[in-house]
UniProtKB/Swiss-Prot annotation:
Residue numbers binding S-adenosyl-L-methionine: 86-87, 105-106, 130-131, 150-153
Family (UniProt): Belongs to the methyltransferase superfamily. Fibrillarin family.
Annotated SUPFAM superfamilies: S-adenosyl-L-methionine-dependent methyltransferases (SSF53335)
Protein name: Fibrillarin-like rRNA/tRNA 2'-O-methyltransferase
Database matches in SMART domains: Fibrillarin (SM01206)
Subunit structure: Interacts with nop5. Component of box C/D small ribonucleoprotein (sRNP) particles that contain rpl7ae, FlpA and nop5, plus a guide RNA.
UniProt KW keywords: Methyltransferase, RNA-binding, rRNA processing, Transferase, tRNA processing
GO biological process terms on file: box C/D sno(s)RNA 3'-end processing; tRNA processing
Gene that encodes the chain: flpA
Biological role stated in the UniProt entry: Involved in pre-rRNA and tRNA processing. Utilizes the methyl donor S-adenosyl-L-methionine to catalyze the site-specific 2'-hydroxyl methylation of ribose moieties in rRNA and tRNA. Site specificity is provided by a guide RNA that base pairs with the substrate. Methylation occurs at a characteristic distance from the sequence involved in base pairing with the guide RNA.
Length: 227
């Protein structure tokens, strides 16, 4: 017998499987829609999508005991590197119809994969753009509550800072998935993470840093706040 209960983060749920193992899930905003072949659970008349931590760095962070999750119902999110929408679809479930995701993606081919998803998920606005040039999409993106970044670039930290400068509300939060090998393959991941933390701390208050193993190798997730 599968059971669903609320997670400590609003909009996130815990699914207790037949074998007693726990998984995380979000309540499907668009019942019947699957985004990346995820498992769907029906429970008390609602549909829940299992959030696969092997396919989503944010999912991995929650599974690893993330303490700060500023993405909440009704919030606006600038998502840098939205790709084909795997993680964004769960964020869309969490923020609900009152919330909004502005998703920046550099690759037209990848963005095209997002189109069928957003036809039903009107709280996602896909934008073709370059996250290293935040002024490019100024006409399309308002001030937001949260910026989430998943861009495998050497200048990852600078990208978050530059976008926060333009789009993040005062007191708003940034979340960044850092892949150490994208920044410097010659350094130990721990050294790269320390350098990223130092760079972020010059602009933000760094609230949390979390390793994403075993789901993602050489990755960490940082949560920061704009003061």
């Amino acid at each position: 017998m599968v059971e669903v209960k609320k997670h400590k983060f609003p909009g996130v749920y815990i699914v207790i499987d037949d074998d007693g193992s726990e998984k995380i899930a979000t309540k499907n905003l668009v019942p019947g829609q699957r985004v990346y072949g995820e498992r769907v659970i029906k429970w008390e008349g609602e549909e829940y999508r299992i959030w696969n931590p092997h396919r989503s760095k944010l999912g991995a962070a929650i599974m690893n005991g993330l303490k700060n999750f500023p993405i909440k119902p009704g919030k606006s999110v600038l998502y840098l590197g939205i790709a084909s929408g795997t993680t964004a679809s769960h964020v869309s479930d969490v923020i609900g119809w009152e919330g909004k995701i502005f998703g920046i993606e550099f690759s037209p081919r990848v963005l095209r994969e997002l189109v069928p998803i957003v036809e039903d998920r009107k709280n996602i606005v896909p934008i073709l753009g370059d996250a290293t040039k935040p002024e490019e999409y100024r006409a399309l993106v308002p001030k937001v509550d949260v910026i989430f970044e998943d861009v495998a670039q050497p200048t990852q930290a600078k990208i978050l800072i530059d976008n926060a400068e333009v789009y993040l509300k005062k007191g708003g939060y940034g979340m960044i998935a850092v892949k150490s090998r994208s920044i410097d393959v010659t350094k130990e991941p721990e050294q790269v993470f320390r350098e990223v933390e130092k760079e972020l701390s010059e602009y933000f208050e760094v609230i949390e840093r979390l390793n994403l193993e075993p789901y993602e190798k050489d990755h960490a997730l940082f949560v920061v706040r704009k003061t």
